[in-house]
C-alpha cells in the first residue's frame, strides 16, 4: 500500500439553527435521496429517479460528512469521473478525458464567468455553503451552448430559510492551510438576504527540489509545487418576493487573491501574481400559472490579473518613443496583465402544455472583452455570441419520456452553428431505467485561444511561449450514450457507456522555437491549433448501498480512452495518440457509518480514490496513485437561546 495516505481530519465548526431533530434527519435521508429534485439535465424539475437525462447528484449529507477543504477536493473525492490538479491559474478540471474548456460550470443554474489561462477559479466558492451538486455528462450544447461538450457541473448553494441565521466554518490543516467562512442571513417580510465572507490561505508545499532548466533536470530548486497564496471573497445575495407571481434577485461578489512565488536557483521569478474580480447579477422570475413561468437574468463580471513586482525586471517591451528604450518594471509596482469583462443576458420560458408536454425555450447573448497590453495585437480584443434554443419533453407513455431540442448559435469569428439533441427514458419495470441520448456538441474558441500570447513556466517545467491563433475553427462533436439504472430502496446503481467524436478539437500543439524566442531563452513554443480529429470511448459505473439505517457504501469507476490526431507528428499524423494529461482509470469508494443519540450524532467516513497513470505527449507520464482518508463528524444539539423549543446544532 505504497500510496496509502490516511488522514484524520477534525474539520469545521458550524453553528446554525435547524427545524428538524437529529433522529428525524436519519429517518428521512433515504427518501430524500430517492426523491431528490434535479434540474440540470433538461432545465426543468424532475425527481432524480425520473430524470430523462442521467444526472449524478452529490447530496447535502455527503457534503456535510466529507468536510472538504476545497471544491476541487470535494468533487474529486466524491465523483470518479472528475480529476483536478491545482495551479496558480485556477482549478485544472477534467471530466471523462476532456479539460476545463469543455466543461460548463454553473452556480444555481447560471454560468460561472471569468477565467485565467482557460481555468475557472473554484477557490471563490465556499464548500460549506453548498446544498448539492448536479453533474450531467456528455454534450449539452443544445441547452447550454458552448463549453458543454464534456458535460455540466451545477453547484446549488444553500438558501436561508430562517428569520435569522449565523453560520461559521473554520478549518486548519498542515502547510498553513486555513479555511474560514462566515455567513449571516435574515428574512424580513418578503425579503431574504445572505451576506458571506470566505477566506483561504496556504503556505504552499513542494515534493521535489528538481527543476527543468535549459534542457537539464537540476537539483537545488526553491520552486514550490503549490505556491503560497491567500484569497477572500465577499458576497451578498438578496431575494425579494414582490407578490405571488414575481420574484426578483440581486447578487454581488468581490474577490482578491495573492500568489507568492519563490525566487531562487534556476529561475528568476521577478513577480508574484495578484487577482481582483467583481461581479453583479440581477434576475427575475414571473409565474404565469400552472407551473409556467418566464425568467430573465443579466450579469456583468470584471476579472483582473496583475503582476506584483518584488524585483526589478528589464523587459523585452519598448517604450513608445523615438529612443526605443526598453520598459523596466521596478520592485513594488503592480502591472496589469489582463482585464477580462463579460456580459451575459438570458431570457427563458417554460410551458407545461397539458399533462404530456413541457416546452423550454430561450435566447442568450454573451459579450467578452479582453484587454492585455503587450499580449494582444492592439492591446485589446472582443467576441460576442448570440443564441436561441428550444426543447420539448414528451411523455409518450407512462413509462416512456422523449426529449428533443436544438440550439442555434451565431459567433463573431466562427459564424452560425446548430446543435441538436435527442434523449429517451424508458422504464421496463418498477426499479429499472433505460436511458439513451445522441447530441451534436459545439465549442467556440475562447477569446484567449484566438488572440492571447504570453511566455511562462508552469509547474517547474521549461520556459514556454504560448501563442493564440485567429484562424481557429469552432469545435464540434458527436456524442452518443446508452445506460441502465437500478433504483431500489437499499441499493441503487447505474452503468453508462458512451462515445464522443470531436472534430477540429483545439489543443496546445508544440511548434518550432523561433530565433527570437531562443534569444530570450525560451525552451518550448506552443500554439493553439485545430487537431484533425479526437475520439473518446468510455464507461461510468456508480452505486449506492445502504444495508442498514446507520451504514452506507457508495462508489464508482470511470474508464475513458481519449485520443487525438496531432498535425505536427510527421508521418504519424493520422495515428491516434493519448490526449495530454489524461488518465484512463479513476475510481472511488466511500464507507459511512452514522448513529444518533438524543442530543448527539457521530459520523465516521472512509474515503478512497484511485487514479491511473496520467499520460503526456511530449513530457514524462505522471505515476498513478491512491489516497485514503478517514473523517469523523460530530453534531451536538443544544437549547436555542431565544426559542427554547428549537434545537441549536454545533458540528465539528
Describe the function of each predicted region:
Residues 162-163, 171, 186-273:
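Periplasmic-side early beta-strands and strand-to-turn transitions of outer-membrane beta-barrels
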Residues 227, 332-348, 381, 387-389, ...:
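Outer membrane beta-barrel strand-and-loop segments of large Gram-negative receptors
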Residues 110-137:
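Short acidic/polar hinge/loop motifs at secondary-structure boundaries
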Residues 72-110, 131:
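Extracytoplasmic beta-strand/coil segments of soluble accessory domains associated
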Residues 304, 412-417, 426, 431-480, ...:
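Surface-exposed extracellular loop regions of Gram-negative outer-membrane beta-barrel proteins
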Amino acid at each position: 500500500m505504497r500510496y496509502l495516505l490516511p488522514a484524520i481530519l477534525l474539520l469545521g465548526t458550524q453553528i446554525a439553527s435547524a427545524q428538524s431533530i437529529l433522529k428525524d434527519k436519519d429517518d428521512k435521508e433515504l427518501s430524500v435521496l430517492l426523491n431528490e429534485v434535479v434540474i440540470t439535465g433538461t432545465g426543468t424539475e424532475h425527481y432524480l429517479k425520473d430524470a430523462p437525462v442521467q444526472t449524478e447528484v452529490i447530496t447535502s449529507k455527503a457534503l456535510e460528512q466529507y468536510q472538504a477543504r476545497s471544491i476541487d477536493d470535494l468533487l474529486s473525492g466524491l465523483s470518479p469521473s472528475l480529476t483536478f490538479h491545482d495551479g496558480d491559474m485556477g482549478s485544472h478540471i477534467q471530466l471523462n478525458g476532456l479539460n476545463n474548456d469543455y466543461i460548463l460550470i454553473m452556480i444555481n443554474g447560471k454560468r460561472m464567468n471569468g477565467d485565467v489561462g482557460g481555468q475557472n477559479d473554484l477557490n471563490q466558492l465556499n464548500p460549506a455553503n453548498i446544498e448539492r451538486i448536479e453533474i450531467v455528462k456528455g454534450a449539452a450544447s443544445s441547452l447550454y451552448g458552448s463549453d458543454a461538450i464534456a458535460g455540466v457541473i451545477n453547484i446549488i448553494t444553500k438558501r436561508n430559510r430562517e428569520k435569522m441565521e449565523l453560520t461559521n466554518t473554520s478549518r486548519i490543516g498542515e502547510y498553513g492551510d486555513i479555511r474560514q467562512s462566515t455567513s449571516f442571513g435574515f428574512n424580513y417580510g418578503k425579503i431574504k438576504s445572505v451576506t458571506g465572507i470566505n477566506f483561504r490561505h496556504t503556505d504552499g508545499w513542494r515534493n521535489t527540489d528538481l527543476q527543468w532548466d535549459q534542457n537539464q533536470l537540476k537539483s537545488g530548486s526553491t520552486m514550490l509545487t503549490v505556491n503560497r497564496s491567500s484569497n477572500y471573497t465577499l458576497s451578498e445575495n438578496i431575494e425579494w418576493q414582490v407578490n405571488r407571481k414575481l420574484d426578483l434577485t440581486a447578487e454581488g461578489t468581490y474577490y482578491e487573491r495573492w500568489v507568492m512565488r519563490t525566487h531562487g536557483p534556476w529561475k528568476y521569478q521577478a513577480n508574484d501574481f495578484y487577482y481582483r474580480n467583481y461581479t453583479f447579477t440581477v434576475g427575475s422570475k414571473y409565474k404565469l400559472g400552472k407551473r409556467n413561468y418566464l425568467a430573465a437574468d443579466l450579469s456583468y463580471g470584471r476579472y483582473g490579473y496583475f503582476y506584483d513586482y518584488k524585483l526589478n525586471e528589464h523587459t523585452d517591451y519598448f517604450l513608445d518613443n523615438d529612443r526605443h528604450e526598453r520598459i523596466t518594471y521596478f520592485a513594488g509596482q503592480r502591472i496589469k496583465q489582463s482585464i477580462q469583462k463579460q456580459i451575459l443576458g438570458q431570457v427563458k420560458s417554460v410551458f407545461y402544455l397539458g399533462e404530456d408536454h413541457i416546452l423550454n425555450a430561450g435566447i442568450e447573448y454573451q459579450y467578452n472583452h479582453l484587454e492585455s497590453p503587450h499580449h494582444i495585437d492592439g492591446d485589446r480584443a472582443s467576441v460576442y455570441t448570440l443564441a436561441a434554443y428550444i426543447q420539448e419533453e414528451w411523455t409518450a407513455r407512462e413509462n416512456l419520456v422523449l426529449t428533443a431540442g436544438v440550439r442555434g448559435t451565431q459567433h463573431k469569428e466562427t459564424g452560425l452553428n446548430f446543435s441538436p439533441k435527442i434523449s429517451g427514458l424508458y422504464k421496463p419495470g418498477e426499479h429499472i431505467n433505460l436511458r439513451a441520448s445522441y447530441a451534436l456538441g459545439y465549442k467556440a474558441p475562447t477569446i484567449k485561444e484566438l488572440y492571447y500570447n504570453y511566455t511562462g513556466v508552469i509547474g517547474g517545467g521549461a520556459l514556454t511561449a504560448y501563442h493564440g491563433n485567429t484562424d481557429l475553427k469552432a469545435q464540434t462533436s458527436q456524442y452518443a450514450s446508452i445506460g441502465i439504472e437500478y433504483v431500489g430502496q437499499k441499493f441503487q446503481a447505474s452503468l453508462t457507456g458512451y462515445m464522443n467524436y470531436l472534430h477540429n478539437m483545439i489543443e496546445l500543439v508544440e511548434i518550432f522555437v523561433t530565433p527570437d524566442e531562443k534569444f530570450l531563452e525560451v525552451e518550448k513554443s506552443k500554439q493553439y491549433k485545430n487537431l484533425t480529429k479526437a475520439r473518446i470511448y468510455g464507461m461510468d459505473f456508480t452505486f449506492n448501498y445502504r444495508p442498514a439505517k446507520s451504514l452506507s457504501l457508495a462508489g464508482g469507476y470511470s474508464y475513458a480512452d481519449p485520443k487525438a490526431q496531432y498535425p505536427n507528428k510527421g508521418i504519424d499524423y493520422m495515428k491516434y495518440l493519448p490526449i495530454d494529461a489524461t488518465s484512463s482509470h479513476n475510481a472511488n469508494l466511500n464507507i459511512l457509518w452514522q448513529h444518533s443519540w438524543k442530543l448527539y450524532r457521530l459520523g465516521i467516513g472512509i474515503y478512497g480514490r484511485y487514479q491511473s497513470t496520467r499520460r503526456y505527449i511530449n513530457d514524462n507520464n505522471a505515476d498513478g496513485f491512491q489516497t485514503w482518508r478517514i473523517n469523523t463528524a460530530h453534531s451536538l444539539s443544544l437549547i436555542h437561546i431565544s426559542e427554547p423549543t428549537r434545537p441549536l446544532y454545533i458540528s465539528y
